[in-house]
Amino acid sequence: MPSVSLSTSKPTTARADVLILGIRGDEDKGELAETLDLLGFSGEKGQTTRFPSGGLAKAPVVIAVALPAEPTAEDLRRAAARAVRSVKNAATVAVALHPAGVDEVEAIAEGITLGSYRYDAYKSAPQGDAQRIELASAVILTPFARQTTATKAVERAATVAEAVNTARDWVNTPPGDLRPADFAESITAHVSSSLGGNEVKVSVWDDKRLAKERCGGILGVGRGSDSPPRLVTLTYEPADAVSHLALVGKGITFDSGGLSIKSGPGMSTMKIDMAGAAAVVAATVAIAQLGLPVRVTAYACIAENMPSGDATRPGDVLHMRNGSTVEVLNTDAEGRLVLADGLALAVEAEADHIVDVATLTGACVVALGERTSGILSSDEDFAGTVLASSRAAGESMWPLPIAEEMKASVHSSNVADLRQHNPKPYGGALFAAAFLREFVGEVPWAHLDIAGPSFNDGAAYDYTPNGGTGVGVRTLVRLASELAGVR
Ligand code: BES
Ligand code: ZN
Ligand code: ZN
């Protein structure tokens, strides 16, 4: 990850290998007008072009990036990332994107760190000519450089973007190398290496403890795997906490579908199914690093969903943590079962608000596309707060209703209190949320269905790499600062 700093230098005098220069329209082109025109740089938002500075600037290479006349923070986050991704073989960049304020400086810093992410843990080291110089440092050029609010914004950006990158790493790890015990251990190691003292406490329940604690949902899903399930709980309890936020994440390290097995292509990306747990853990660590005055209890509900001679069958009934019974009718709808126990624990912990994050349904992807997460909630005000946080963070989310008729359907099991799977194939994301709502009592709760945005199976764009995206982390950190009333 490059280190990011601030400077009041002018773009032409900044010392760096590459100058990234934002162009907001013809006036911004100045002496470069002819060069940019010859390169076919039309100024269409997001466009980039690269050329030697020819002595016009100290930096030997310029990357021009087109900006709108009045770029938003998200425009700048994307532009910074896009430009940084096109840097090849340079160690230092100076970034001149004309931030209008400190929020924009923060967005640029986030874009730099998010855009430089690469997952190469399993790539052999490049040989000879293929060896690349990594970007080591970036300096953002702004007149605000000497203001402490700007320095703080850059520090905050580093914390948040590194948390996003941590979540990406977990999602990208091959599922055979991140089975439930591995994931739990990796979370424990991450917490202790990221925080100095014991600001965040970690507790891990193994399968025996889960049985003692009557977590029948997590156990039922993990039953078919040789690698038994885990529940990892993180607690951050600052003395000045003004509110208690519980986060619950779906942590299916691999979703084969279980006995209701998926098709080959359907399961090929299912290592992503722990992206919700990755997001809540990474966000909790970031919230603690930032010292936000909000108590956070995060539950990573971790299991591997596999078929076997002893896997949970369609027709089986599970005894859940909150005392209710659930008839399983499709073992591929496993996320709601592990989340239900986490949600019940969050209610027991007397949280003021609960947010769960889950790659829950293909239906949500059908409804909102691959880049927008669904927000489903029991409380309109709280849903509004979450939506506002997602906007401020630059993550695309949109509310979906929990349609009235779903309640009766969730209660229509002939043998148990609840049924886990809707006999009708419509509104799958809504039914899943109606099921989860049964476990949150009266606590204001929002469910983020990130099935689409958690993974990018195409080429990298803006700050979104191929593979795990780390979606949810930025919204959760914003939400915590919103609830804490600080920035
Ligand atoms: N993990 C999947 C949901 C998913 C699908 C995530 C595509 C990311 C991309 C989930 O466990 C699942 O299999 N859901 C089923 C539910 C159905 C059986 C009611 C689905 O969406 O098909
Ligand atoms: Zn599934
Ligand atoms: Zn799943």
Regions found by a protein language model. Give the residues of each.
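A generic structural signal for tightly packed, nonpolar segments enriched in small/aliphatic residues
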Residues: 167, 183-487
